[in-house]
């Protein structure tokens, strides 16, 4: 394609719809043709001399897909056309939420913006009208009109194309048909790219990846799969007739099979053994043999065997998977007319006896997860995500959950699997909680599969656990039914998903912000508006401060003084952010309700500083490093009047505000605030004292938590690791007795701590480590007898929770443990794997956040890293042959006199350890 000049007066011709740039090959060598196409925006090239937009439908040509098949030029002849081009680019990026950081350049020269591979982050569908100009075999496309297409409306258009076809005239059908076919082709090409392990495009890495998009892609996969099977199978030799799973021959020895073709039935794994190491595909289809019963689900086909550097799951070789119906599954079809069959009471004991490979479909409620709070997918490098599922019955559910007794513990074993189920950018506790409807009474449907779980810190062959395979919610199904059958051109862009996700962004202070070179984060911050600039036509620039400091590199802070010109923010004490016009209009309208004026009216002439108003804002911000500097885009901004705090901020965010008020009051100064008392009292909890000076009054900042008047609150009790043993009733027992289901049944009034201490012996078979929870999986069953993996019901989980207990266990300060890399601590714990130890444990309750439901857990007492090392060094003491005898049951790490005295009801004074370095954790 060559660069030609656009004709001044293009001819009036009928516009031709093109589905590929290959259509241009049949055009005359010298021609001017109006054309139209639909494609994905892939690149933006904006310099001082030209403006180019790249589009592609990713049609394959040979072995590679041709990117930027349509390279469109915008007019750039003079200042007027240049300004129009920049406004067009700005509006287009604003629609698709693409940041343009350099448009706010401080220099006088026109900024340069070069963005590539936009489709790797977001799908920007666009309908373009262009002028095709060719000469001597070369051609150029000149943009005449561009219409961005919202992804929600694109999916709706494809899904309802058959319905719409009957409502249009024949002339309209041509355009609608071309539009639908192009959109379908693009999605099909993206699916092929997603399957290709070498291609960087993956659906789960998209910013707007969610359950709706996932289900739509799966539906498209099924259509592609049916077409490919119909074309590929030889009618004279059909492998499936012989009971053999069909799979293309070129994939038989492909170690990355599951990333290439997820639509084919699962291959026979009986001959693969331990040699096949797969990585789960981000978008997978449901198993072909259960399509009728799992079509309602929104997640992927279960991976039978997957391995990652951190963790792997597997199935025994004697378990055969084929299409002959011999799978060990108990199917409960959602399409069965007898809907009550799925709501029958769950037998948790029967579920605990299920064999590996079994699949169950259940309806009920996920009431909690562990860890309950996390901010990043990287926190699961050394632990799993556990969900606690219970059935919804007419009676009031139990307040105390005991896995295997009145609930099911569902494990998501790997980081990759978490991303696959919820999306890369949804891997935060608040967002996953929202997806799972933890805070709502709605029921959900889950499909779980029995798998073997093990990792680097798990004794072979691992544990048989229930893993989440599919999930469905009624609210999502209703939302899909209610989507109107309209064309993409008539549907306004949906911002509902963005606002919903923004409410779940983690709340941090400016000093806590850290970014890697290519990292993008979505955060919530509270801050005071310091200054505002309307210099740029495409967006508004702001300076905010929460009065914490961060040395991250950013653009210069303008007009940064705080009421008095002499009192200026330091350059690392605030941050510069931009807001596009549609977000600003919403923000400005809220300010008008408070001040009866907009921001422009509040400014004093050309003075851009607004610190005299004390405007406190809650901001949902997208942050990223661009050209080595902080690029912050405010996606949603809301003023926070002090009288409305309880409706705007959550209880945890109120604590952020409380600290913010203290910093702001100290930094701005009591005298300065007093001069603008009437303005500041709108946003700050202040009152006048006897000297007519402003004072903070925190009693007005309290956030009233929601209380249930009919439900007595459970008391969470996490015992201290260094608790006095003499305060417990000591019982010597074994793990089997503690795991007995009747013994673990929650008591009706179990709302207080346990006073019983159990002394028992167990072998550590797995270790999970999270920043908030250290978990030892222990059992007393012999390893030689376990050839199919231990069931969780035969394993006791010991949890060490709270920073105080962490510090006591490692004999280090909390500050030191926060600085110490997770890998280092995890490696130190590995030496205990597979060995038997004596433990003193007690039953405890941990509450799920914002609920009245508690989880029963086991916590050790008098257990430290050093004490476990001592037991490891003296195996005869730690692993006695008769675990039932009194002498052998006493933990070698606890003073035996104290235990015996406690058993006889005698209190023994705890002796202090004078060896300061005795408990130091070795580095190796």
UniProtKB/Swiss-Prot annotation:
- Locate the region Disordered: 265-336
Give the UniProt subcellular location, in the record's own words.
Chromosome, Telomere
Q: Note the effect listed for residue 72 to T.
A: Disrupts interaction with POL1 and FUN12
One GO biological process this protein is involved in is: telomere maintenance
According to the UniProt record, which residues make up the DNA-binding region? Answer: 500-686
- Give the result of residue 243 to R, as annotated: Disrupts interaction with POL1 and FUN12
State its role: Single-stranded telomeric DNA-binding protein that regulates telomere replication. Has a role in both positive and negative regulation. Promotes [TG(1-3)] strand lengthening via interaction with EST1. Promotes [C(1-3)A] strand re-synthesis by DNA polymerase alpha via interaction with POL1. Negatively regulates telomere elongation of the G strand via binding with STN1 thereby inhibiting telomerase activity.
The miscellaneous remark of the record is:
Present with 319 molecules/cell in log phase SD medium.
Q: How does it assemble?
A: Interacts with POL1, EST1, FUN12, STM1, STN1 and TEN1.
Note the Pfam families from the entry: CDC13_N (PF16853), Cdc13_OB2 (PF18691), Cdc13_OB4_dimer (PF18233), POT1 (PF02765)
**Name of protein:** Cell division control protein 13
List the biased-composition ranges (Basic and acidic residues). Answer: 309-326
Q: What does UniProt list as this organism's lineage?
A: Eukaryota, Fungi, Dikarya, Ascomycota, Saccharomycotina
- What keywords appear on the UniProt entry? Cell cycle, Cell division, Chromosome, DNA-binding, Phosphoprotein, Telomere
State the GO CC annotations: chromosome, telomeric region; CST complex; nuclear telomere cap complex
Polar residues bias (residue ranges): 295-308
Q: Which InterPro entries does the record match to this protein? A: Cdc13_N, Cdc13_OB2, Cdc13_OB4_dimer, NA-bd_OB-fold, POT1, Telomer_end-bd_POT1/Cdc13
Post-translational modification Phosphoserine, affected residues: 306, 333
Q: Which residues carry this modification: Phosphothreonine?
A: 308
What coarse category fits the chief subcellular location reported for this protein?
Answer: nucleus
Q: What is the effect of changing residue 523 to V?
A: Increase in length of X' and Y' telomeres. Disrupts interaction with POL1 but not FUN12
Superkingdom of this protein's organism: Eukaryota
């Amino acid at each position: 394609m060559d660069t030609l000049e656009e004709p001044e007066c293009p001819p009036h011709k009928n516009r031709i719809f093109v589905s590929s740039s290959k259509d241009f090959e049949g055009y005359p060598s010298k021609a001017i043709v109006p054309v139209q196409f639909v494609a994905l925006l892939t690149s933006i090239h904006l310099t001082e001399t030209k403006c180019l937009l790249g589009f592609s439908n990713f049609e394959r040509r040979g072995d590679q897909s041709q990117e930027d098949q349509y390279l469109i030029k915008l007019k750039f002849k003079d200042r007027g056309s240049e300004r129009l081009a920049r406004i067009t680019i700005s509006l287009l990026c604003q629609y698709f939420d693409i940041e343009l950081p350099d448009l706010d350049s401080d220099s006088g020269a026109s900024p340069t913006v070069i963005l590539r591979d936009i489709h790797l982050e977001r799908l920007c569908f666009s309908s373009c009208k262009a002028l095709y100009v060719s000469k001597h075999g070369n051609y150029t496309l000149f943009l005449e009109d561009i219409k961005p297409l919202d992804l929600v409306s694109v999916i709706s258009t494809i899904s309802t194309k058959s319905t719409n076809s009957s409502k249009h005239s024949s002339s309209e059908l041509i355009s609608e048909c071309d539009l639908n076919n192009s959109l379908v082709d693009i999605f099909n090409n993206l699916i092929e790219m997603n399957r290709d392990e070498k291609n960087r495009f993956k659906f789960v890495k998209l910013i707007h990846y969610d359950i709706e998009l996932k289900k739509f892609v799966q539906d498209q996969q099924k259509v592609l799969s049916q077409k490919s099977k119909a074309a590929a199978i030889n009618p004279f030799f059909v492998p499936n007739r012989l009971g053999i799973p069909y799979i293309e021959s070129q994939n038989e020895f492909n170690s990355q099979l599951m990333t290439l073709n997820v639509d084919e039935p699962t291959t026979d794994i009986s001959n693969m053994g331990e040699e096949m190491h797969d990585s789960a595909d981000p978008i997978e289809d449901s198993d072909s043999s259960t399509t009728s019963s799992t079509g309602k689900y929104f997640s992927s086909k279960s991976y039978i065997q997957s391995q990652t550097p951190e963790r792997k799951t597997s199935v025994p070789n004697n378990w055969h998977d084929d299409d002959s119906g011999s799978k060990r599954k108990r199917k409960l079809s959602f399409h069965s007319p007898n809907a009550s069959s799925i709501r029958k009471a769950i037998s948790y004991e029967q579920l605990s006896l299920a064999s590996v490979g079994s699949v169950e479909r259940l309806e009920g409620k996920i009431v909690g997860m562990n860890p309950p709070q996390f901010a990043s997918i990287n926190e699961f490098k050394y632990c799993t995500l556990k969900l606690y599922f219970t059935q919804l019955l007419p009676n009031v559910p139990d307040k105390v959950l005991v896995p295997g007794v009145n609930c099911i513990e569902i494990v998501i074993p790997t980081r990759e699997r978490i991303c696959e189920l919820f999306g890369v950018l949804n891997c935060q506790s608040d967002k996953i909680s929202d997806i799972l409807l933890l805070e709502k009474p709605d029921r959900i449907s889950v499909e779980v599969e029995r798998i073997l779980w093990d990792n680097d810190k798990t004794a072979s062959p691992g544990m048989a656990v229930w893993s989440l395979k599919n999930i469905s919610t009624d609210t999502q199904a209703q939302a899909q039914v209610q989507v109107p059958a309209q064309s993409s051109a008539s549907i306004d862009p949906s911002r509902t998903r963005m606002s919903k996700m923004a409410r779940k962004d983690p709340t941090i202070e400016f000093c806590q912000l850290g970014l890697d070179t290519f990292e993008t984060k979505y955060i919530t911050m509270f801050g005071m508006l310091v200054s505002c600039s309307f210099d740029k036509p495409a967006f508004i620039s702001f300076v905010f401060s929460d009065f914490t400091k961060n040395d991250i590199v950013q653009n210069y802070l303008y007009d940064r003084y705080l009421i008095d010109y002499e009192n200026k923010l330091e350059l690392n004490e605030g941050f510069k952010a931009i807001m596009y016009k549609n977000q600003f209009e919403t923000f400005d309208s809220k300010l008008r309700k408070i001040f009866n004026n907009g921001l422009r009216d509040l400014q004093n002439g050309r003075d851009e500083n607004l610190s005299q108003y004390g405007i406190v804002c809650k901001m949902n911000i997208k942050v990223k490093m661009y050209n080595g500097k902080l690029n912050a885009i405010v996606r949603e901004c809301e003023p926070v009047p002090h009288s409305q705090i309880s409706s705007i901020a959550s209880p945890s965010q109120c604590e952020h505000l409380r600290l913010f008020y203290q910093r702001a009051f100290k930094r701005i100064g009591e005298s300065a605030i007093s001069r603008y008392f009437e303005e500041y009292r709108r946003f700050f909890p202040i009152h006048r004292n006897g000297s007519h000076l402003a004072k903070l009054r925190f009693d007005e900042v309290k956030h009233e938590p929601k209380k249930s008047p009919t439900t007595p609150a459970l008391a969470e009790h996490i015992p201290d690791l260094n608790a006095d043993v003499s305060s417990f009733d000591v019982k010597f027992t074994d793990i089997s007795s503690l795991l007995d289901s009747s013994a673990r049944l929650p008591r009706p009034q179990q709302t207080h701590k346990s006073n019983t201490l159990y002394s028992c012996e167990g072998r550590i078979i797995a270790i999970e480590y999270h920043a908030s929870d250290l978990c030892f999986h222990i059992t007393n069953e012999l390893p030689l007898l376990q050839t199919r993996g231990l069931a969780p019901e035969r394993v006791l989980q010991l949890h060490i929770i709270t920073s105080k207990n962490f510090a006591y266990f490692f004999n280090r300060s909390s500050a030191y443990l926060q600085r110490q890399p997770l890998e280092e601590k995890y490696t130190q714990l590995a030496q205990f794997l597979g060995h038997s130890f004596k433990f003193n444990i007690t039953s405890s309750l941990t509450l799920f956040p914002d609920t009245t439901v508690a989880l029963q857990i086991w916590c050790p007492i008098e257990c430290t890293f050093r004490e476990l090392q001592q037991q490891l060094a003296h195996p005869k003491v730690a692993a006695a042959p008769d675990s039932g005898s009194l002498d052998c049951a006493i933990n070698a790490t606890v003073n035996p006199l104290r235990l015996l005295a406690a058993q006889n009801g005698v209190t023994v004074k705890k002796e202090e350890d004078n060896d300061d370095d005795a408990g130091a954790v070795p580095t190796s």
